[in-house]
C-alpha cells in the first residue's frame, strides 16, 4: 500500500501555549497531528512588539511559509501588506478563530482607544477572511460571520484531550459544596450577570458552600464568600477536580455570543455539572437539566445553585452526562481527524 505523503503545516499563532486560545486550538492538537503523519511548526506572535521583533517574525514567517504546504493563522489578525506578502510565498492559507474578533472584549468595550484599535483590526480581519483558502471557526456564530467573506468555512469546536481530563472521583458532601470558575481576569466582568442570584443563594445556604475563583486576578462580590487561587499553566485539571459545580456566567454581548464556551467543556470533561448563561455557544454545549442548568435571571441562578448544592446525586448524574457529551462532540480525539482532513484538502488545492 502506498504511504500517504506527509503534509507540512506552519501555525502562526496569536499567543504561545501559556494562553488558552492558542493552546487549545493548536498546541494540544500537535501530538495527534504528528501521529497522523503531519510535520508541524508553530511560530507564536511576539508578546512585545518592537521594530526588531517585528522584522524577525516577518522573516521567520516567510521562511516557514515557503517550507510548509499549509499556513494556518490562528487568531492572528495582522496588516494586509504582510498577509499579501506571505500569500505570494504560499497561497494555501487557513484562518482559525475562536472569538468575535470584530468587537472589543467586554472589559474594554467603553475604552475609546481600544475601540479605535478594533476599527482597524476589523479591516484586517475582513481581508484575511477573503484571502484564506479555508476558515475554521470555533462555533456556528463565528462561522456565520465568516461566511460573509469566505466561501469555505468549517466549524471545529474548541476541544479537550480526554487523556488529560480524567473524571472527578471525590465529591464534597453538603457540608461544603464548591462552586468554581476558571478563566482569564478580563472575563471576571461576566459575574455581573449572576451576582444577584449568587448573593441570594449564599444568603440562604451560608457557609455550607463557597465560590472558588481560579485566575490571575481575584474577584470580590458583595455577600458572596470567594476563595481565590492563582492560576498555573499545568494545574488546570487539579483546579477543576477541586470544584463540585462549574459556573459560566456570561453577559449577553456581541463578544460573549462569539465565545466558544471552553470553560463549560472543561467542566463537563471532568464530570462536573454546569450552570451557564444561555448566551452563544453555551446553548449548544449545556443541555438544560441534562448536563447542567441554563440560567438567565437572578431567580434562575438562585434555583440552579440551590438544586445542585442540595443534591449530590444530581451533581454526579448531570456530570456523567456532560462527560459523555464531551466524548461525543468536544474531544481532540474526535476532532483531530476532522482538522487533518481540512489541512490535507487545502494542501492539495
Which ranges hold each PLM region?
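Nucleotide-sugar donor-binding and catalytic loop/hinge architecture
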Residues: 2-7, 163-178, 328, 345
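Membrane-proximal helix-turn-helix segments that form the acceptor-binding/catalytic region
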Residues: 57-67, 81-89, 99-103, 114-135, ...
Amino acid at each position: 500500500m502506498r504511504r500517504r505523503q506527509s503534509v507540512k503545516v506552519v501555525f502562526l499563532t496569536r499567543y504561545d501555549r501559556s494562553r488558552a486560545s492558542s493552546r487549545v486550538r493548536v498546541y494540544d492538537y500537535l501530538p495527534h497531528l504528528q501521529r497522523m503523519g503531519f510535520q508541524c511548526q508553530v511560530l507564536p506572535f511576539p508578546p512585545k512588539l518592537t521594530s526588531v521583533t517585528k522584522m524577525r517574525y516577518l522573516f521567520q514567517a516567510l521562511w516557514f511559509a515557503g517550507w510548509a504546504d499549509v499556513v494556518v493563522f490562528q487568531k492572528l489578525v495582522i496588516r494586509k501588506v504582510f498577509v499579501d506578502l506571505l500569500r505570494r510565498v504560499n497561497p494555501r492559507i487557513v484562518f482559525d478563530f475562536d472569538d468575535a474578533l470584530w468587537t472589543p472584549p467586554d472589559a474594554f468595550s467603553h475604552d475609546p482607544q481600544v475601540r479605535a484599535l478594533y476599527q482597524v483590526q476589523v479591516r484586517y480581519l475582513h481581508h484575511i477572511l477573503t484571502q484564506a483558502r479555508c476558515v475554521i471557526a470555533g462555533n456556528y456564530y463565528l462561522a456565520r460571520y465568516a461566511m460573509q467573506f469566505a466561501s469555505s468555512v468549517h466549524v471545529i469546536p474548541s476541544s479537550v484531550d480526554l487523556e488529560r481530563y480524567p473524571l472527578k472521583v471525590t465529591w464534597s458532601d453538603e457540608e461544603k459544596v464548591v462552586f468554581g470558575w476558571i478563566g482569564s481576569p478580563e472575563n471576571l466582568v461576566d459575574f455581573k450577570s449572576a451576582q444577584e442570584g449568587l448573593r441570594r443563594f449564599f444568603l440562604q445556604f451560608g457557609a455550607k458552600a463557597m465560590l472558588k475563583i481560579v485566575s490571575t486576578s481575584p474577584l470580590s462580590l458583595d455577600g458572596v464568600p470567594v476563595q481565590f487561587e492563582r492560576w498555573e499553566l499545568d494545574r488546570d485539571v487539579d483546579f477543576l477536580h477541586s470544584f463540585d459545580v462549574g459556573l459560566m456566567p456570561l453577559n449577553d454581548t456581541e463578544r460573549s455570543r462569539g465565545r466558544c464556551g471552553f470553560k463549560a467543556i472543561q467542566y463537563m470533561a471532568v464530570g462536573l455539572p454546569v450552570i451557564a448563561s444561555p448566551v452563544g455557544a453555551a446553548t449548544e454545549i449545556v443541555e438544560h437539566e441534562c448536563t447542567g442548568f441554563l440560567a438567565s435571571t437572578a431567580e434562575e441562578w438562585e434555583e440552579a445553585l440551590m438544586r445542585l448544592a442540595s443534591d449530590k446525586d444530581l451533581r454526579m448524574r448531570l456530570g456523567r452526562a456532560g462527560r459523555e457529551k464531551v466524548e461525543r462532540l468536544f474531544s481532540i480525539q474526535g476532532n483531530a481527524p476532522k482538522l487533518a482532513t481540512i489541512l490535507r484538502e487545502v494542501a492539495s488545492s
